[in-house]
Amino acid sequence: MCATHTHSGPTGTLQEDFVAGYHNVKVTGRYDPHLVGYMIRSIESGIHHAYNHREQAVIRYGFNQVTSVASNRNDASIECDQTLLAIEISLVGGSKILVYNYGCHPTVLSARNSLYTSDWLLGVKKQASKDGYDMTVFLNGSSADISTRYTRIESTFKEADRLGALVYQHIREALQYTEILLTQEHVTYSKQHNMKLKDTHESVDISIPILRLDDLYFLFIPAELCSTLSLPIRNKYGQKVIFCTLSNNCYAYIADQKAYENQWYEALASPFAMGEGEKLMEMIDGYIKEII
């Protein structure tokens, strides 16, 4: 279960006891069980429909480095992960699906906007539809500290479409030089990791599922993860290690030590103690060594 968020969605989706009290009701609103129930039923319906309508498919994928779309939102000079993975799924029935992984907050629109929107993701979808894709699926990468803060010209729907079109341009380029996914099976792994909470002696166990498809390793992180934490691992193992964040749960932010030292928002909004992000990456690094 992979999610993302814009700054233009409904309130009421987080419970008040969310992560040991790290929950800002003024921002996220009171928990709305009716809204959440509707969302759960919709997701369940989608899962059942997809499972009951499975088809054979040809899957191809490619990578690209994105430019001029996003940067570190605290300091644009800090290096961040700009790798984009594009996956094209061509079903035997004729439908074509685009799945892409890229680390960036879809937050072009500002607080002045009061309309629900998928932000620049809609710009991608519009362009993909022109190329015959029936569905687009976004897997957000390590985006906790990445946004369009220093790259957007203005906070408008037009600008969201422009940046979305720019992301799609990089997707098209990635799919010009592709590899075919040959596997008929997938392999899944799962690793538990204990993380200490700040300002308390308590801790939580988080689960990190890993999906292997051929030589691709998808790591599912149940929080917004800072790019500064995951980038060294991607630099070490290459593009085949793919981080998908806000997956299966939402433990707010996992920030690096520098964010705590500078009191950046990612650290202030994180429920975890300083240094826990680095410990998580150390665990992941060791586990990847075992399974690759």
Task: Go through each PLM region and give its residues.
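Conserved beta-alpha junction segments in alpha/beta enzyme cores
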Residues: M1-S143, S147-R152, F157-R162, L175, ...
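Anionic-ligand-binding alpha/beta catalytic cores of soluble enzymes and soluble regulatory domains
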Residues: V167-R172
